[in-house]
Structures are given as C-alpha cells and as structure tokens.
Amino acid sequence: MLNSRIYIISFLFLLNSFAFGNLIRPSDGDELNYIHILFEWEQQPDAIGYNLQVSTDEFFNNLILDVDETYTVYIDSDNFNWNDTYYWRVRSIMDCDGCEYGDWIGTSMFSISQSTPPYIDEGVEIESSTDIYQDDLLEDGYVAIGAFSPGPHSFIIDKYGNEIWNSGILLENEGWFSDGFILNHINEYGNISGYSGLNYPYNTGMKANTDMDVVWSTMNPEPVDMHEFKQISNGNYMGFQNVYAVGPIPSDNFMTETFQMLGYQADGVTPEFPWFGQKIVEWNSDHEVVWSWNPFDHFTMDDFDNYGGTWWYSFNEGSHDWMHSNAFHFDEEESVIYVSHRHLSRISKIAYPSGDVIWNMGLPAEYNTGDNNICTDLRFSFQHNIQLVDDGDLLFFDNGNLSEMLLGDSNPTTRIRRIRVIDNSYCETIWEYELPPNLYGSAAGSVQLLDNGNYSIYTIGTGSVIEVTPEQEIIWKHTGNINSAWGWYYRAYKIPSIHPDAFSVIADNYTVDENSNNIIQISGNSLDFTIINKSGYTQPYQFSFGESTDGPPMFDYEEGDFTLGPNESIELSFAVLDGNISSTNINFSIWPVHHDYALKELSYNITTNDTLLGDLNGDGTINVVDIVMLVNIILNGEEYNPVADLNSDGTINVVD
C-alpha cells in the first residue's frame, strides 16, 4: 500500500571503513508490491563480479536463483511469485590464486504481497483475457493500467497478461476516499503520477515510485481532480482543480421542463444553478501555487453541451459539470498548454503564462459550443488524452459519443486521431483509426504512440487495451473482467521497465590495504568510475565530485551531467592535479535527474600506489619515527592527514 511519508531515499556508502559493504535492496523485512525484483548491493573490494543467490528458505537449500553479475544491480523478471517469502545473499567473484569467491556479505529476507484479487460475480470468478496475434510486431515492454473501481488502483501486466506490479490491494474503505492509487500519467523517464485518497485530500495529486512511496504531492487542502496530474518540463507540477460559479439552465434542452417542474426558470439566462469547471493549477516543488488558469475568465457560459446528456447528470447531481476537463499537455518549447474539455467537445491551445486562448478546436457553431472553433470538419466529441507528439502532431482519443449525429455513423464510434494544426487555423489528418463497434468507449480512454510506430490504446468498450500497427492491425489485446467493476480502467501506458531508477556505480581499483581498510588505489593519473543504466529508460544523470579534506587538493571539484540509454555505460575520469599528494578522501554524489530520490552518496579513501598508510615521513617503512609524528599530530591538533588516519574514521586520535 501507499506510504504516507514523503522523503528522498539516499544510499550512503561509507566505503572507507573496515566493513566490506552491505545488501541495499530489497532491505531486510521488505514487503514488495511487484515480482520483477531489483537486487542491489555495495561494491566489494577486489571483486571482478558477484554471485547472487536467492532461496525460499533461510539455509539456501532451495535455490531459485543462482546467477553471476558484473555490476552491483541485478533485475530478475522470471523467478518470483506473489504472496511468498525469499532470502537473498551476495558474494564477490575474485581473481586471485585459491580464492574464487569472497565471503557472503550477509543475508536479507523479503516478501511479496498478494496480486490484485479476481472479481467475483455471484460466486463466479470473472477473469481477464490476453491475446497475442502478432508477437514479432509488438513493442517490447509492459502495460501499466490505472483503474477506477472498486476504488482507485493500478497494476502492470506483461504481454501474457500476468500481473507484475500493483499499487496495493484495497481490502477495506473502498471508493474515492480509499488509500488506493490510480495512475493517470507515466512520462518518458518512468515517473508515475496520479490520484490517491491517502490522507485525503493531500495526496490527490502525487508522484510515486515503484515501491509506492510518496515522492511528491500537492499537500493541498483543495482536492486535485483525478483526470491528470504530472510533473511538467520546467520542474513544477500541474493538475486540475474544480472552480465554481452560478449559471443558467438552458431553455431548449430535453431536461428543461424537468427543471422547471422544480421551480427553476430554466430560461437560458437567469443565473440560478451551480456550475463547475476545472482550473489549471501549477505548483512549485515547495507546494506553492505559482500559476493558475480559470476557465470562467476565458470562456463564455453561452457555450455548453446541449446534446450529450450532461444536463441529465446535472439534474441528478445538483450541479452542472460544465467542462469536464480531462487532459493537458504543457509544451515548454512553444510556451503553450493544450487542454481537452470533454463536455464542450473542445480542445484549447492556451498561451503560457498569459493564459490567452490562442484557439479552440471543436464543433461547428450550430452545436452551441463556440462560434470561432477551428477544424470544425473533424467533428470529434467527448474526447480524452490530448498530447503533443515529438513531430508536433496532436494525438487524442475521440470517444465519439455524438458521432451518429455529427458524422452520420450507424452507431456511436470511437476514433484515434493524429492531426497537425496548420497556421493555427485548420487541421490535416495524419493518421486515424476507427475502433470496431464492440470497442466503442463512451467514457475514459487513452492512446500512446510507441517507439516502434505502433499505438497502444485503451477503451472502456469491453475494458480492452489493444496494440495497433500503423497499418491498423490489432496485434495484441488485453480485456479486463468484462462487465465487472474491475474492468473499469482509466488509462494505459506501455513502459519498458518497472525500475526506472536502477543504475550501478563501480569504482576502478577498489581494494583493501594492509590494515584491511577499503580504499581506491590509483595506479595512473586519474580516478575512474563506471556508471551503467539498468533502468530500461533513457535517463539523464547529474553528479558532483570533490574532496572532503583540507589542504592542497589532489583533484578539482567537478559537477556535470550525462545521458545514458538503456543498459548503456559511461566512464567518468577525474584527473590527478598534484602527483606529490599521496592520499585524500573524496565524496562522489550521483543521481538520475528525474528520480533524485535514488541519489547515491559515495565516500572513498584514495591513495596512490606507493602510499603506505601510517608512513608519515614517506620513507617506505612504518617505525618509531612515524609513531612520534602521529603523537605530535594528535597533541598539537595539526591539519588532517589521511595517511595518519589508520582506521579511516575521518579523525586522527589515540585509536589510530
């Protein structure tokens, strides 16, 4: 389940100690919400690789995994099951005479929680189904799904329909105020955003990691709308919140007389009924509102849905859901926001930060949703999931609730539309896909352009996620528990991995000195590290490197950044400034830019090849002269000298 704490996870490796390192994750006693397990441990001295073992018993009599790994991160996607307990350990692979393996670092235990339970209808289990029609055409990866009912919950499946991750199981307090989580966005770096009733309403707009820790949330007493919330490219966060006004009831709607029977004027003029729309809100990292856009300041209440049945809902709910804004795309390059307003069958392009409406795309004037809409020939209706793809096209899910009236369809028809807006005035259709009649989706829905050119589509029609080629061939289909609460999904995303924060750092020449201290022994003119991206995503990284001791520097202080593709590695080299300095201590911090909670803070004791710890006069031997010099350093409080710090605890005292 979700954790209510908000924190940054920092791995602190004190590698200049006597200890040989630790197992990092899973931590001892962890209960995981996924079966693709990421194992991570600290680098071991003189290791050329590592042997990882996992067993179902603490004595390791029943090994389910026995594998060698070059780096300090290993992800297994084949050997683990829901609702089970495991034990794991790691040892070094050595390259020396008579020592193939080092000692076991230790043993940790972890368990895996249960998978999402099946839906039971009158005692009968309703199962989902998954069909692969063209495996060789599929985009590699997994499908992440955010679901509405029986309360907010999310899960990820593989191409066979097997669940590999979930956001936590709803056991009680189901509904919108439960502590469940519905994902509504996963970006290109693997950041998960969505809605949760945990500590309602403070986490109704939140970002989480794979372990469902709350990485960031609005912490706002005003609830965030569940349709879309995400971190935008300027580093801030954006979402919808309801805003209210009083407006008229239309005089020519099929519900007009019903309202009049209750005493309303319903004349299309008199302000007498509560309306609400969705304002766009931007928060900075300190949870402060730094920008907002109120639709009542930019749109006229003369524009409203008069054909889609929204006033029937208004009558029953006691307020009019005027806009039902459900998606936005923030484009920092052009400094605009594209917004989908479902109940107006309208997509707007808004200048940022002025808030001026550049254009509204929607229906012809006779449908009462605006007199100056562009691209009226498209005649889309009740759309979802507007987005701008890399080449500048707009891609969205056209639910088509009004397609019979607008397009002459024989039945309501859902379409995927990829269009290009020309000169902010008219549209060119780049690609269009008409879903089969049984997949018509009157609500929700999403579409994603995949790296291989396919489209991943979710439709509430039969609760299905499909993958479609550019030639409009369905090559994969997952159908939820049909006609059940569990089948009501909201959005789906195809992703390459469930561990977007996974990376490993290896220090060259990491060894042990004659006093059993862990050190890096420089053999040339540079200190070298290898970093490998194990996340499955292309990730940018940042780092800082510097010394933690006073006196003349052995290295320059450096900060920098780089980008790695999936499973790519890079070598970072830091040049030695002064070859006469024989030892120092350095701090090396590195983190994925979009997953800064995965910060690694590394500290090392550095020596050159000819440095003998304790040899204070540099004569190549340790004798009484060095002892006298050490005593004088302690008595006189002289400047820190790493060669005198025999136990590498950062201070020089009688223990040394």
Regions found by a protein language model. Name each.
Residues 105-606:
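Histidine-/acidic-rich catalytic cores in large beta-rich domains
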Residues 616-643, 648-656:
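Alpha-helical segments with a strong preference for the paired helices of cellulosomal dockerin domains
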Residues 51-83, 95-108:
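Recognizes extended acidic, P/S/T-rich segments that occur
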Residues 77-85, 577-582:
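Surface-exposed, short loops/turns at beta-strand junctions within beta-sandwich domains
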Residues 86, 90, 588-590:
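Hydrophobic/tyrosine-rich beta-strand signature of extracellular beta-sandwich/beta-rich modules
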Residues 4-17:
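Sec-dependent N-terminal signal peptides
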Residues 21-45, 82, 101-122:
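Pro/Thr/Ser/Gly-rich low-complexity, intrinsically disordered linker/stalk tracts
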Residues 32-38, 522-526, 625:
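Short coil/turn motif common to extracellular beta-sandwich-like domains
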